Amino acid sequence: MSSDTDELLARLEADAAAEKGDDGGEPEASGSKPSREDQKPDTGGVINRYQAGVLSDRYLEMVLADWKNTGLLLMQAPLLAAMAVSVWGNVDRATPTLYFVMVLSMFWVGCMNACREIVKERELFLRERMFNLDVGAYLFSKIRVLSLVAIVQVGLYTVICAKWIDVRVPIGWLGLILLATAISGTCLGLLISSAVKRSDYAVAWVPLVIIPQIIFSEFTIDADQFQGISEWLFRLMPARWPFESLLEFGQTSTHYLTAVSYVLPALVYSVLFLAVAYPILRMQRY
């Protein structure tokens, strides 16, 4: 892992020097071909693909090396699924409350996975920013690895619930909807992590973004009872749309196009959360 970090820092220094015109080297002959080491890595347009690859590899190694914490994160899913089974395992068919609990559980899991992942390495991030670290590549590396974690968690949760509960939703669609929910929570967690300066602040913010998902939902009152600003907040809650999708799939006559369309806002929220986190990270300096 240290060799990857040293290599990345070396390339960042080279890029920074190249941009400032401080190379100080002799110009190459017109017919000579620059070596691979002298070529600037392809940025790939939106993000620096070289940095994204190195950062992803480094972050994945860190996640795997911290096997105790990773194991605890992965254990959340089967434990939450077991709780759901203990309540709905003997019920004839799934209820709207079950669907809401499933969505909220995966949103919580995704948010908790990510809420400390930037702030805990704030010093490293700020140091590498001095050497031209690409913020887009950095965020991409986080969501790439955390999405793999979410896939495992959602897979465990989905299989356990579908095995012992009559969810009335095809297992493939159930997994995709819950994965979109978990990734949306992950992106919100990364936004929180980019905006705070201490890990304990990040953890404290998680309930403050989860509880509104409960308050402004059909879990508390009927949708037609929300009025004024509460109605707008009800419509804006990220967890609402995957819940609506599960409700549609759970009906006897499912309108698949409608059910799938309800998942799209979760993906839009994921992009929105990252889009807000990006300038926040770009503005941070020592």
PLM ranges: what are they?
Residues 31-54, 229-239:
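Short, membrane-interfacial amphipathic segments enriched in basic
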Residues 12-13, 52, 108:
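Generic hydrophobic, helix-prone segments enriched in Leu/Val/Ile
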Residues 61-286:
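Membrane-spanning alpha-helical segments of multipass transporters and channels
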Residues 54-55, 61:
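Cytosolic transmitter module of two-component histidine kinases
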Residues 28-39, 64-74:
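Alpha-helical transmembrane segments of integral membrane proteins, especially early/N-terminal helices
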